[in-house]
Amino acid sequence: MSIGVQSSGINISHAELSRLVDAGKSEQGDKAVRDDGRALARADAALAAVVGERVAARRDAVAGSGAQRVELARPKPDAQTRATDRRTVSGLEREHKRLAASQTPRVTGMHDALVQRHVSLDGAKAAHGEGVKRAAGDAPRAAADAPQRFAFADDKAFDAMLALGAAMQKNVQSDLAMQGKLTMLAHDAMMSAAAQDRSIGAAQMTAAIAGGALQATTSLGGAMQQMKSLSTKSMSIEKELKPQAELKQFHAEQALELRGINKPVLSNDEVSHVKIKRDTGETVRHEIDHGGERMSDEHASVLAQEAPARQHRIDMHGMRHEENLVKAGRQQMKGDLLQSGGQIGKNQIDGASAQQQGADRAEQKEDENAQQTAMAAASTRDEAAHRSREAAQKAIDAAKSQVANDNAVAAQVAGNLRT
């Protein structure tokens, strides 16, 4: 088996390649043999040195003969680069999946290790330049002693992937912090709305208690005034109307006596006198003329003198009754005013309570709107984070596709080298 370098005329046998690979193994022993990565690095460096020597000799020979000189570029360790690219992209993909699933920025160990290992491009470039200088003389020893570096550390695409991962972590941290703040805002708005509900209920209860107490007090006061009015009317009937009625009856009887109507008729026993009870309670005895049909002038004169006094007393009873009715009317009016005032006071309390409830409901609406706004902002933020994770996943998929394409190209180049 041999490896051919196109356009150079150089053939390297399998035995010679094995000798070059084994040249740097004496100091490392079995441990270096088991280290596949380091063995591949030494083999690539040795291959580069041999190709360089053969190309230099060929170039000198061609220059001496006057033919056109062909220069070959130094081959890159494609196998190691492709393998490390695959591992790197796979690691980024796993880290991205864990980060998207857990939504916590603490799952970043692998990414931080990659950043610390590969982000220092200056050191990698310096080591790479030093390795190129020593490749022609002491390539195996230089490859063994140099620190393990990856050729893709100089690749801008890989740096972009690292920057994308760091930005994604920072974005996740910012998303979590913002979602926490928005969630707290929504929680505070919900608690404030609940407090407004309690305030509205307390205002309604206070208004109901105050209005009920005021209305009960005024209703009781009005009822007491109405009872006084009824009592005044009852007293006036008892003390004024009844005596007035009795006086009117007595006055009418006396008037009939004066006119000779219903005067006493003498029976066969011929009673000689009649007793008349005055309004003062005094009983007066009058003699009856047995032969006449009219009272004596003396008796008529006595009855006529007492009539005006009786009429005056009748009129005074009527006037006092009217005064009592007026007093009862005032008491009735006070009762009605008290009841009306209680209703008005209750309406005022209800109005003040309704105003307070309206203000509380307005604040409640504001809190509910703030809660809805915070929830909408949180949802929008979460959707933006989801889109960011999708974009990162697409970038990783693109990197995987690029690695796959590089592998395909490398396989094709290797196939061409074998032919």
UniProtKB/Swiss-Prot annotation:
Annotated region (Disordered), positions in chain: 62-91, 338-402
Subcellular location: Secreted
Any Pfam family the entry gives: IpaC_SipC
InterPro entries on file: BipC/SctB
Main location: secreted
Cellular component GO terms, alphabetical: extracellular region
Alphabetized UniProt keyword annotations: Secreted, Virulence
Recorded family membership: Belongs to the SctB/SipC family.
Misc note: Human meliodoisis patients have detectable antibody response to BipC. However, BipC does not act as a protective antigen.
UniProt-recorded name of the protein: Effector protein BipC
Organism: Burkholderia pseudomallei (strain K96243)
Lineage: Bacteria, Pseudomonadati, Pseudomonadota, Betaproteobacteria, Burkholderiales
